Each structure stands twice: as structure tokens, then as C-alpha cells.
Amino acid sequence: MSYIVNLTGNRTSKDGSIMGKVHDFKEEMALHEQSELNVYRKHPQLTACDRRVTVYNRHTQQKVQAIMFGSNSYLGATIFPEAIQKAIEVTKEFGIGSGGVPLLTGTSIYQEELEKLIAKISGMDDTILFSSGYTANLGVISGLIRPNNLIIHDKLDHASLLDGTVMSGAKMIRYKHGDINDLERLLKDNSPQYPNGILVVTDGVFSMDGDIAKLPQILEITRKYDAILLVDEAHAIGVIGDKGAGTLSHYGITDRKNIILTGTLSKAIGTVGGYITASQDVIDYLRIYARSNMFSTSLPPSVCAAAIEVIKVMQSTEIVEHLKQNAEYLQNKLKSEGFNIMNTETPIIP
């Protein structure tokens, strides 16, 4: 008997009520607990996110030693000694939180330093920090885009980008994943109706498949039709490009005109938070109109300070190159054993 649970974000209840879906889910989970699949969150880690971890299996009530292959801490930065020590020092000096929103009392010297550092490695003018990469994507799209605009997404764009689109009220269409011809067709067909009003959105590195967006071609077509390009660098920063500088660096793209980048500090950087980095004019505008930033408490100074230390390690060592070598080694071994790892170009293995 199958006990597969519907874990999509589009549940409806049998009776159409608000709480009905909650009760339906409870019934499904009661059946699911009887199976051995047990995909629901049940196994907390008892140790730091390292190569080897100890987890507690609540189903068996046993501690389990495991090798970590499921983390998104690509560089192992969650346990960098330099970052840990800096976080401790800054916590003692500044406390455990920022104490305010960015436009009032929440901006620390470490936040400003981190914003400048991200802009520098990304080749942009300035940066805004957010509480997560998710809220950064919500903020940039809902802040810039209005219902009279059009957003064109890659079919496999991250959920946060789609949610930001819904919040903006703009029309959305999607091109076939990685299909440059389909993207150009949509731009050609729609640009007369939306002069200077189209945003093209893509992940830099796609989080599920591990492939890299064809940015040179996407950028050429986007500029041909006077559109703006938004690239989500969540799985690219610290992973690809020179010293982990991301997708634009990976392709050697130096002209940043009409490009906006978003990203996260919670993956390769190993802390928590997100960012938008772009031209000065765009950043100045979004500091006021990105509501997910303006109405959220700023990141703790200790988090910003730790992220700075991680980026310094990225920029001064060969750790990103070592990540690439390790990923290629594992992928080659898996392929030699007959595993299909699809078309991944990064450490992500589908």
C-alpha cells in the first residue's frame, strides 16, 4: 500500500474549508507514519553540519552516524574557524541581534561592509541585505514590477521568484528550460505590448538539476528587446566563477548594464540571509520599495561579520577550485558505477 503524501504548495481540502486541508494532511500523515518512507521532518542533527554528522532518528529513537551528502553548505563554511571566532567576538561586542530595521536602527558597520564586499565581487555598485534569499527575491520583483509589466521565467526558476511575481501582479509567462529560441520567441511576440517593461528571470545555477543558465545568449537576447535581466545566484555564489564570484564571472561577462543579481548567504557562505546587488540607482530605489527589506529586522552583526570572513577565505584560497575537483571526482565515480547524474555542471547531483 502506498502512503505517498502530497507535499506541493497547492493543497485543497475535501470540503473546501480553510482548516479542512490541515485535517486532511493530519490523516495522511497518520498513514505515512506507518510506512518506512518517513519523509516528514523527524531526524534533527545533533552535531554541526560537517562531513560526518550525528542525527537522531525519532522513528527508531536511535542516534545515527552519517556522511553528509544532503547539505547546501558547499564549502563547509558553517564550521570555518575564522568565521566562528569572528562571530563570537562580534556577538560579545554587539549582542545577538541587530535591534531594528535597516532604515532606522538596524544597520551595523558589518552590514555595510558586507554589502560593499558582495557588490565588489559581483561587479556591481551596491547591495541590500535581506533576512533570506527568499525574501530578497520577493523584494526585488514586487518592488520593481507592476501589473502593467511582463515577467518571463525559465520553466525551472525557484519558487521564491515565482512568488515574487505573484505579489507584483504582473503577467507571467515561462519559456522551456534553457531553451534560448523559446525565450526569443516570447520576447519577440510580447515586446511590442510591453515596451521597456519586460523582466527576464533565471536561476544562475538551477538548484534541482545543477545546470548553469546560458547567460551570454540570454543576455544578448534580453538586451536586443530592451528587457531587464534578473539572475538568482543562490547556488552560484561561492560555487562557480573566479574565486566563487558567480555566473557572470563564470562566463567572463563584464558589462553589468540592465542586470540585477540576487543571492543567499545560507548556502556556500554558510550563514543566513540574502541580498540584491545591482546598479546604485536600483539599490537606492529598492531600499525604500522592497518591502521585505524595509519592514524586516536587519541581520545580526555577528552573521554579517562571519559572512565577511567566509568571503575572505573564498577570495584568498583555492577552496572553490577544491570544491570543483571534489564534485567532479564524485560524479565520475557515480557515472562509472552506472548512475545517471543527468546534465549537472556543478556540485549539485540530481
What are these regions (language model features)?
Residues M1-T12, V22, K26-F94:
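N-terminal "arm"/small-domain region of PLP-dependent enzymes with the aminotransferase-like
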Residues S73, I173, H177-V231:
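Active-site phosphate-binding strand-loop segment of PLP-dependent enzymes
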Residues Q85-S132:
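Conserved N-terminal alpha-helix of the aminotransferase class I/II PLP-enzyme fold
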Residues V140-A159:
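Conserved PLP-anchoring active-site segment centered on the Schiff-base-forming lysine
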Residues K243, S249-Y285:
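Active-site PLP attachment segment
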Residues S302-E321, N332-S336:
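Amphipathic alpha-helix from the class-I
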Residues K324-E328, K335-P350:
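Conserved PLP-binding catalytic core of the aspartate aminotransferase-like
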